[in-house]
Amino acid sequence: MGSQLVPPPSAFNYIESQRDEFQLSHDLTEIVLQFPSTASQITARLSRSCMKIDHCVIEYRQQVPINASGTVIVEIHDKRMTDNESLQASWTFPIRCNIDLHYFSSSFFSLKDPIPWKLYYRVSDSNVHQMTHFAKFKGKLKLSSAKHSVDIPFRAPTVKILAKQFSEKDIDFWHVGYGKWERRLVKSASSSRFGLRGPIEINPGESWATKSAIGPTNRNADLDIEEELLPYRELNRLGTNILDPGESASIVGIQRSQSNITMSMSQLNELVRSTVHECIKTSCIPSTPKSLS
């Protein structure tokens, strides 16, 4: 999802964590954010409220030599998602660039669950020794509560660069996109009872034989799967000569109605002439008179 640089909002009523030194690591390392106190969370839980992050600020202040090189990567994860889908936003910037990172959430969370957001950093391609205290991080967090969730307009991540020798061309940031969805049709009671099916859909590499089923669908309750009778599935292994049913009945009927006799134009004229001559000859013979007796 594309993002752009915009001025970050002014901070007020933020929960601030301590500005702590962190060691350089090539592996993801957590930056602990300060969330509302347990008492505040219990109060919101008793009022049956849900919460969201309005705004999160991550302040990065480097403390490395001027010839230090490398890239710092900061990531925000939502632990309600599976591990390979938990990443929500990320930033990359030079290790010597003092910077403020701004993140805006687009979802609510329940206080009955652990607070899902985790903040991590790692450093790549650096000439600074690992385990060196290379920078200080500080997190500022603003949350809000609501009786129920509502649609939240999307706001892209932003940055505020505090080092004059760097610009937005040296920074990159990313935000997760909306999840994919597709319409799923509901099976009616009648179609489920009698095993009725829709039309067969033939996909590339398939044939009618691989998709044709006979009889009602049997459902395996133990495995929760539908068992189909597909007697023609293996027919594609046979040769085309065996499977070819021949010409259709309509083509055969047309062929039977067609004559194999061919005549030239002169032969046709001669046939017509002789036929006409015979007709004239027959019609011109006088009838035998009847005798009067």
UniProtKB/Swiss-Prot annotation:
Which cysteine-cysteine pairs are annotated as disulfide bonds in the entry?
none
Annotated GO CC locations? host cell endoplasmic reticulum membrane; host cell plasma membrane; membrane
Show which residues constitute the signal peptide.
none
| UniProt GO BP | transport of virus in host, cell to cell
Q: Which organism is it from?
A: Squash leaf curl virus (SLCV)
Coiled-coil intervals:
none
Q: What is the effect of changing residue 67 to A?
A: No effect on subcellular location. Reduced levels of infectivity and very attenuated disease symptoms. No effect on NSP relocalization
Q: Transmembrane residues, as ranges?
A: none
Q: Which InterPro entries match?
A: Gemini_BL
What is the role of the protein in this entry? Transports viral genome to neighboring plant cells directly through plasmosdesmata, without any budding. The movement protein allows efficient cell to cell propagation, by bypassing the host cell wall barrier. Begomovirus genome is shuttled out of nucleus by Nuclear shuttle protein (NSP) and the movement protein transports the DNA-NSP complex to cell plasmodesmata and facilitates further movement across the cell wall.
According to its UniProt record, which protein family does this protein belong to? Belongs to the begomovirus movement protein BC1 family.
- The organism's superkingdom is given as Viruses
Zinc-finger as UniProt keyword: no
An example of a GO molecular function for this protein is:
DNA binding
The protein's topology relative to the membrane is: Peripheral membrane protein
Provide the record's note on post-translational modification: Phosphorylated.
Protein keywords: DNA-binding, Host cell membrane, Host endoplasmic reticulum, Host membrane, Host microsome, Membrane, Phosphoprotein, Transport, Viral movement protein
Report the protein name in the record: Movement protein BC1
Q: What is the effect of changing residue 35 to A?
A: No effect on subcellular location. Reduced levels of infectivity and very attenuated disease symptoms. No effect on NSP relocalization
Q: Which lineage is the organism of this entry classified under, starting from the top rank?
A: Viruses, Monodnaviria, Shotokuvirae, Cressdnaviricota, Repensiviricetes
Question: Partners and quaternary state?
Answer: Binds to dimeric supercoiled plasmid DNA.
Q: Which Pfam families has this protein been placed in? A: Gemini_BL1
